[in-house]
Amino acid sequence: MTAIAKSAAKVTCDGANTSFIISASTAALLALGRFVFLPFQRSMVSRHGLPEQNGVPTTRRVTAVRRRWWSMLKTNDPAGFTLVDVLAWGALGHAVGFFILATATNGYNGFQ
């Protein structure tokens, strides 16, 4: 007769929870960048004007090569949310998500 040992294994779904936290924080920061900070930045630029170098606005200093590169970064977003904005806010969202995961699993419980 063989004895069956009871295992103390614990089944968790950490992978799904991790994916959800990273996705939710990335989506939240993309929405924050698109609907909060982009209009704020546009209103500040319209209020204070574009930066100048030697009295010439930076929009006049754009060469043909720069125009070609800038056309690749444009999107069809009505507000003008560019590819660089998506990458930057997405990276911030990932950083916030990893911060949440790191602080949630470090074992410190300061509220006890």
Curated annotation (Swiss-Prot):
Provenance organism: Syntrichia ruralis (Great hairy screw-moss)
Name recorded for this polypeptide: Photosystem I reaction center subunit V, chloroplastic
Domain of life: Eukaryota
Gene: PSAG
Transmembrane portions of the chain: 20-40, 81-101
Record has Chloroplast as a keyword: yes
Signal peptide: none
Primary localization: plastid
Keywords on record: Chloroplast, Membrane, Photosynthesis, Photosystem I, Plastid, Thylakoid, Transit peptide, Transmembrane, Transmembrane helix
A GO CC annotation given for this chain: chloroplast thylakoid membrane
Primary role: Not yet known.
Protein localization: Plastid, Chloroplast thylakoid membrane
